[in-house]
Amino acid sequence: MSTGKIVQIIGAVVDIEFPAAEMPNINDALVSQEANVTFEVQQLLGDGVVRTIAMGSSDGLRRGMVIENTGDAIKVPVGKATLGRIMNVLGEPVDHGGAINAEDKWSIHRAAPAYDELSNSTELLETGIKVIDLLCPFAKGGKVGLFGGAGVGKTVNMMELIRNIAVEHSGYSVFAGVGERTREGNDFYYEMKESDVLDKVSLVYGQMNEPAGNRFRVALTGLTMAEYFREEGRDVLFFVDNIYRYTLAGTEVSALLGRMPSAVGYQPTLAEEMGKLQERIASTKKGSITSIQAVYVPADDLTDPSPATTFAHLDSTVVLSRQIAELGIYPAVDPLDSTSRQLDPLVVGEEHYSTARRVQGVLQRYKELRDIIAILGMDELSEDDKAVVTRARKVQRFLSQPFFVAEVFTGAPGKYVPLKDTIRDFKAIVDGEYDHLPEQAFYMVGSMEEAVAKAEKMQAEHK
């Protein structure tokens, strides 16, 4: 094992000099026993000097400190021993639960599956959330993006998806918290504990307050754990909150390494780094990784290079809208902006497809009529348009749903709605079968039976 010495420290970037014949390779892990910090080699500068990123605070480091080369990339524990545990970017436990006795350790840098190993299953993954199952269904082994600005509910939606899928489908999940709030990570841990699904989830956190190196690599740590479960032949879920912070950490690292920035100050290697991560999130003939990724949209601008680069890799996009959140409709999913490759009659069936398109058609017509209503009022509309508007308002409210993970805030018990019920109920609304019910009865309920019961209760209170 070769040793070198620190020659320069600039924030998280540390230059280390080795004997010319014993230079480490790119992505090798170097360790300081004295400061208990791991470094990852990013550039070979020549004359025996390598430029590295510290996977921890560089406080306490000094020039001349001895650094050892491990001769390998960062390796993290994988397998069942990681379930129910919180780990950092190096796979070390941070939950005071003792050591992780994993049967194996894998490198966080791995090649994507070969082309002939990939599978192309079109099986649907039912989430129990009406608006998602109807309008932007998820594929088992697909990639989903939850797009939204600050505070529109990305993390809450993700927590609900983990809870529903873990409880209803009983599969393993890996959650990578990339550069998010420590408070959310804490809430998330206790939410999983209360829902009795913690023993099926591996948690890997690289929070906002951690150095850029940790935030940049923590997604790869989580992905490596998910890949192990896939290679065992399992169907695993991989959650990332938040992909934007992964890009942002890459931008910080890139600037520290002295690379020239590209559009909007992002790193020039943005598309390559995103591709390396996303291409590994794949389903093979052995097992599948279904990935759900929260994507923060800076200033609600979907054309920003970071969300725009992410779009290209996804099968389904769930766009969370501030305008819908302002109406008090949660989940605040935009039914006209959200898309899915699975919404195809050959995949979901003719009834599901036609119901989804009719729901979108009604909402689109309502959107067009809104300006006329604002200027002239409802009375100036034709009878057909009046019917469209009342149905659209009912559909809009029926797309809301009480969440299990938000019970403490809303006071309403959460609801899981099977897909067949969702299709039946929305078809009935657009067919006009429930034109006699008040629109308020459709707000924050699960199935149509609840909406009818709510309407009867409202009528009884009015008498």
From Swiss-Prot:
Disulphide-bonded residues: none
Main subcellular localisation: membrane
One Pfam match: ATP-synt_ab
Reaction equations catalysed: ATP + H2O + 4 H(+)(in) = ADP + phosphate + 5 H(+)(out)
Enzyme Commission designation: 7.1.2.2
Membrane topology according to the record: Peripheral membrane protein
Subcellular localization, as worded in the UniProt entry: Cell inner membrane
Signal peptide: none
PANTHER family, per database record: ATP SYNTHASE, ATP SYNTHASE SUBUNIT BETA, MITOCHONDRIAL
Record NCBIfam families: atpD
Family: Belongs to the ATPase alpha/beta chains family.
HAMAP family listed in its UniProt record: ATP_synth_beta_bact (MF_01347)
Subunit comment: F-type ATPases have 2 components, CF(1) - the catalytic core - and CF(0) - the membrane proton channel. CF(1) has five subunits: alpha(3), beta(3), gamma(1), delta(1), epsilon(1). CF(0) has three main subunits: a(1), b(2) and c(9-12). The alpha and beta chains form an alternating ring which encloses part of the gamma chain. CF(1) is attached to CF(0) by a central stalk formed by the gamma and epsilon chains, while a peripheral stalk is formed by the delta and b chains.
Protein name: ATP synthase subunit beta
Organism field: Dichelobacter nodosus (strain VCS1703A)
